[in-house]
Amino acid sequence: MRIYYIGVFRSGGEKALELSEVKDLSQFGFFERSSVGQFMTFFAETVASRTGAGQRQSIEEGNYIGHVYARSEGICGVLITDKEYPVRPAYTLLNKILDEYLVAHPKEEWADVTETNDALKMKQLDTYISKYQDPSQADAIMKVQQELDETKIVLHKTIENVLQRGEKLDNLVDKSESLTASSKMFYKQAKKSNSCCIIM
């Protein structure tokens, strides 16, 4: 999973204007980087120009996907990733970037400019392109799910480690003196109920 490009554009009008951008082209050969970078800028500019206010869209081009979010304020975010990068974290990140950009640079600063300048750059993009290579950093739900999956794995390993070699939970339940007869019966009934659903 990889993010190659993050861009913020002034949209609306015939041609979108790139206000701030960052690229991570380290995956490409030295001599390819310039051409790939130019293509990504061209692609981002084109899709930003052709995305209506309030729209989100993902456009596949070769091995890449351009995630685009155009806001009603006249600003648009573009994220170019590989095909494995999940869609929800991509749009979560775009929303965060556009929110922060509008706070740092109100519309009055960029609405009438004819070309970009350093004053309109968003310095956090350099941090974001490395931090959010891991999509779970952008998506809190995905992060919680990942933590739950890790906990589940630890629990399964713990139960296996508690049981000695060749020992089975059924035998431990039968030998247990701390379980009442009704608890033992409940365990056996629950096991039977669960086993009837197994497809072999």
From Swiss-Prot:
Residues 198-200 form a propeptide. One of its GO terms (biological process) is intracellular protein transport. GO terms for cellular component: autophagosome membrane; cytosol; endoplasmic reticulum membrane; endosome; endosome membrane; fungal-type vacuole; Golgi apparatus; Golgi cis cisterna membrane. CDD domains: Longin, R-SNARE_YKT6. InterPro entries: Longin-like_dom_sf, Longin_dom, R-SNARE_YKT6, Synaptobrevin-like, V_SNARE_CC. The modification Cysteine methyl ester is found at C197. It holds the Pfam family Longin. A lipid is attached at C196 (S-palmitoyl cysteine). Signal peptide: none annotated. Its main location: membrane. Its EC number is 2.3.1.-. Gene3D superfamilies: 1.20.5.110, Longin domain (3.30.450.50). It is a lipid-anchor. Keywords: Cell membrane, Coiled coil, Lipoprotein, Membrane, Methylation, Palmitate, Phosphoprotein, Prenylation, Transferase. The modification Phosphothreonine is found at T158. One of its GO terms (molecular function) is SNAP receptor activity. This is Synaptobrevin homolog YKT6. The lineage of its organism: Eukaryota, Fungi, Dikarya, Ascomycota, Saccharomycotina.
